[in-house]
């Protein structure tokens, strides 16, 4: 099983951990739904920047 850590950042701010143990990532327009292995959901507004499947990391540019 491949689970991801999702990091987000706003312009001129440090990157922060948004969610951990993410099994599903569902883009919905300007929103991104993140579902973890326990079924908990986190919704963020932003744009996907990168996905590194080897390191299990996802980066999102968060809306201001």
Task: Set out the residue ranges of the language-model regions.
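N-terminal acidic leader/helix
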Residues: 1-23
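Structural recognition of beta-strand segments within beta-rich domains
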Residues: 24-27, 33-36, 41-43, 51
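C-terminal structural segments of small proteins and small subunits
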Residues: 2, 10, 40-64
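Short beta-strand/strand-turn micro-motif
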Residues: 16, 20, 32, 42-46
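Context-gated lysine
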Residues: 10, 30-31
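Structural motif
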Residues: 5, 23-24, 31-33, 59
């Amino acid at each position: 099983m491949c689970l991801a850590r999702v990091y987000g950042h706003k312009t001129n701010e440090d990157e922060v951990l948004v969610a951990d143990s993410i099994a599903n990532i569902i883009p919905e327009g300007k929103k991104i739904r993140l579902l973890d292995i326990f079924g908990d959901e986190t919704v963020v507004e932003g744009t996907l920047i990168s996905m590194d499947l080897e390191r299990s990391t996802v980066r999102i540019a968060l809306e201001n």
